[in-house]
Amino acid sequence: MNIKIGSLLLLLIVSDISFAADDGIAYLQQEIKVKVEVLDEPCDIAPGDELINIDYGTIVDKYLYINTRTIGEKFKINLIDCDISISDRVAISFSGIENSKLPGMLSVIPMSGQGDVGIGIGFETESGEFIPLSDEKQYKLNEGDNSFTFNTFVQAEIDRLIARTIKLGEFESSAIFHLNYD
């Protein structure tokens, strides 16, 4: 799973529109004032955490038919050099292409490129609380380094469980994690 982050940028555009007449011809004059403020982020992402790969290894379909989902695979987002005078809170969220049959979960793409696999990937807190795509989880920042642990898991679609038609083979998916500072 590829997880990436972008930077913060605040853009404020103010437009003043006025009309002027010269020699009986009306001209539209537009003055655009642009103010850009680049915000200093309170934390840096630890080197190597910009791209996080998660390998589920081998998942036996019978396990999904019995348990509906896998045990969570842990991963961490490590923030370093945090300056809480800039912000002492961060909201973390995940985004990606949503599985239409498993709301709030990522869809997957079979490596063979053919068909629907019948599974999705979910995110949860370290304690097992489900985090739907685009939902933010708020965390308090400490001065210096901070580490946030999450789990991802594979879950089967209900109709595929009932029909016992989970597609076998390798799959992939990607998501983006977002850091929003208060």
Stretches found by the model and what they are:
Residues N2-I3, F19-D182:
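Mature extracellular/passenger domains of Gram-negative fimbrial/pilin and adhesin proteins
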